[in-house]
């Protein structure tokens, strides 16, 4: 089983970018992997974790906490490491970090077309909630990394 550790090494960067491109196939500029990494590191919250199989990044999870709710983002497991508990370990690790900060509820979003992952999250205690998710891009903050 890969070990879960905070992202802290620029050596991880290229592997995380490749992983996210493989798993998510980014199309929108605001989701550019390098930009996402830079913005998360700038937040300095210590909520960016990688699963390492030796020196190889096998998975990632980013978490966020606003003082009330926590969020999970970019839960990704390389296809060669799936069905081995890596995703579960990453989510549980992020949950523990959020819980230690006083988080009362954790949310996540599933992109349309990836509904199959719903069962995975339900197996971890998450439930589909009747919500409408809305977003607004801030173009001046979307710059290439």
Give residue ranges: language-model regions:
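A short beta-loop-alpha structural element at the N-terminal edge
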Residues: 2-16
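Conserved beta-strand in the GNAT
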Residues: 50, 56-64, 71-76
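Conserved GNAT acetyl-CoA-binding A-motif
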Residues: 98-110
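Conserved beta-strand-loop-alpha-helix junction that forms the acyl-donor binding cleft
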Residues: 108-117, 135-139
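Active-site rim helix/loop that mediates acceptor-substrate recognition in acyltransferases
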Residues: 27-50
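Helix-loop element at the rim of GNAT/NAT acetyltransferase active sites that forms part
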Residues: 17-31
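A conserved beta-turn-beta hairpin within the catalytic core of GNAT-like acetyltransferases
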Residues: 64-73, 82, 128-129
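Conserved acetyl-CoA-binding loop-helix of GNAT-fold acetyltransferases
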Residues: 83-96, 119, 123
């Amino acid at each position: 089983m890969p070990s879960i550790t905070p992202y802290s090494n620029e050596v991880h960067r290229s592997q995380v970018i490749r992983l996210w491109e493989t798993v998510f196939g980014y199309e929108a500029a605001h989701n550019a992997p390098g930009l996402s990494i830079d913005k998360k590191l700038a937040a300095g919250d210590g909520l960016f974790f990688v699963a390492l199989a030796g020196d190889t990044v096998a998975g990632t999870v980013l978490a966020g906490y606003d003082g009330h709710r926590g969020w999970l983002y970019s839960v990704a497991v390389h296809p060669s490491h799936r069905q081995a508990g890596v995703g579960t370990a990453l989510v549980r690790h992020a949950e523990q970090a959020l819980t230690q900060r006083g988080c009362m509820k954790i949310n996540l979003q599933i992109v349309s077309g990836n509904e199959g992952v719903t069962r995975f999250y339900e197996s971890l205690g998450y439930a589909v909630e009747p919500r409408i998710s809305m977003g607004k891009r801030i173009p001046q903050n979307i710059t290439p990394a």
